[in-house]
Amino acid sequence: MKDPKSHKLKFNHYLEKLYQSDKAMIIYKVDQGYDIYTDFSKRINLTKQNIHKFLNSFEKTTYKKQTDQYVGFFGYEILNHLLGIKINKQSKNGFYKGVFYKPETIIQIRDNISIFSNKKKQEFNKYFKPTKILSPFKLNIKYQKYKKIFDIFSKKIRQGETYQIKICTKYRNKSSINPINFFWRLMKSNASPESFMIRDKNYSIVSCSPETLLLKKGNKIITKPIAGTLRKSKKTNMSSALKFFRNNSKETKEHNMIVDMERNDLSRVCVPGTVKIDKEKYVEEYRHLFHYVTSISGSLIKDMTIKNIIKSMMPGGSVIGCPKIRTLELLNQQEKENRNIF
């Protein structure tokens, strides 16, 4: 479809049919708008047995057209396996360790709508799922258990085994959710940079993350760690938030630790001397919060593999702490439930 303008109404009708269908699809926010992926010809469920083969396959792939790509997610546990870190026995919820899809249709929503598809005929099964909250939210850990883990980690910090560590807690409930409606409602109220939605037959994910963990542009790689959060109020603005972060010893030290770790992670895959701070300790404003951010970049070593980039950069320091390896080991000793897509 070479002329998006002449097909605009038709494309909008197509999107409505897609949204109301039961087709698996992914929506991903980009700088200029949104990309939608669907008509998946392949679905790879990641396991300990196939993760290396999957990542290595990209080194032999030639990219001739827009649909020559995979889109999906890595779970926390599969990234630990990739790093060779053992996870103690935990309670599991049966969720996937990671899933990647090969799309045959990509829809770009910009000022106009463009469709790139290898499919000649589109078929839709009409389907609509209303959103209903069926039970109240519950926390997955009791206060005394959380305090016990907190005290153990406090001791580890005093002993110098870790400098910063992030305990994971989950809220859960039973709901019937239309993930597409839910995603677009979030985008109206809080369109964060790393927002996406996955809808498949047996699961959905809706994410609205402000943090850019990993962005590759040509041979340049960028990360924007967030360490520092302030709730918005009528008395706070960008200037007062920046002043708060700069004058707060705790926030500054935590931020510096994460930035140092991310710079070190980048240096593993970048040309020596190219890792630099592009913008240091600035504030990003969202609907309910201010975040303390630093932007870091580097030039990738020639022929650096995707697998090595992922091993170096994931999981991000803002969700685990630092230093990376020892902190992951400590978390895995104490957390009794899988993080999955955390």
Model segments located where?
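Extended alpha-helical targeting/anchoring segments
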Residues: M1-F342
